[in-house]
Amino acid sequence: MALVQQSSPHARRARPTSRVMLWVILAALPGLLAQTLFFGWGNLINVVWCIALALGSEAAFLKLRGKPVAFFLRDNTAAVTGLLLGLSLPQFTPWWVSGIAVVSAIVVAKQLYGGLGSNPFNPAMVGYALALISFPVAMTTNWAEAATLWGGAPGFGETLAKIFTGGQTAVDGWTMATPLDEYKHKIASHTSVEVLGHPTFGDLIARGWEWVNLAFLAGGVLLIALRIITWHIPVAFLAGIAAMSLAFGSNADQYAPLQLHLLAGGTMLGAFFIATDPVSAATSHQGKLIYGAGIGVLVYLIRSWGNYPDAVAFSVLLMNFAVPFIDHYTPPRTYGHHKARRGVPGRSGG
């Protein structure tokens, strides 16, 4: 039997960015499907609108910079930014609020820094945070009540009219606070058992939201299995939330239980799809663990003591600030080299 001789290194060709981003889009579809099934058409409409506007904004700015538009649009990164914003925004967000968020993400947070690979901050979270700070009412009062498509959720036409016309419609009766918001504002005057007994929390812990988070968890596991992302950031993210929740868990009548933190809000979307952005995240495995854990801790702190019930965007952006510091002290090992041994050179113990 003839042996094939091949010189080292036996390196595999890197996956093109367009294929990686396509897998991210496909892995997020179960979460989008769950959002649509349990909260109506709002997120699906937001996703289509945000992706279209993200591609248009990127194309326009690339044209202004004299760059080949078709070449850069094919990397699918603008589509992923639009997708993440559409998944993160409230279901009935006015079109102009989501539009400002998308344009800010693409133009300000990405293209002004030089485009793909040059942005120090997660573009989607920059757009989300800007919209939340600038339009707090629109970003906090347009969440849909959990109602399945077959169980009375607003129709496609009603949802479309609410988003793009802003008029008073029957949809207004379907808006409500999220489970995290409900818990945060009622725990001061009620016991934990009383708060969790509200219909907002459903049979498990967060009516509708638990299935959305589990769907994003399934998509995230797929990305890890395909080696699109590594496990370090998501696991450290969730471990950070769990550690903080367990540390304060003895006071159950003041702080939300662990399962609410894990299965409500944008926890799984943030852990597997947002925090793992390869450009703005830490580089080495050790750095990714620190980065992910920092985000998880910040999410818990802001949810518990901050002004915003969900805190993924601000936590990711704050840790983006820390990435240069983390990378400086946790550089990846150079291929073929070992860590230097401590001690005086030429001296051996004995």
Swiss-Prot record:
CC cofactor: FMN
Lineage: superkingdom: Bacteria
Keyword Phosphoprotein applies: yes
Entry keyword Mitochondrion: no
Modified residues (FMN phosphoryl threonine): 178
Gene name for this UniProt entry: rnfD
E.C. designation(s): 7.-.-.-
Official protein name in the record: Ion-translocating oxidoreductase complex subunit D
Residue stretches spanning the membrane: 20-40, 42-62, 89-109, 120-140, 204-224, 228-248, 255-275, 282-302, 306-326
Enzyme class, broadest EC rank: translocase
Subcellular location: Cell inner membrane
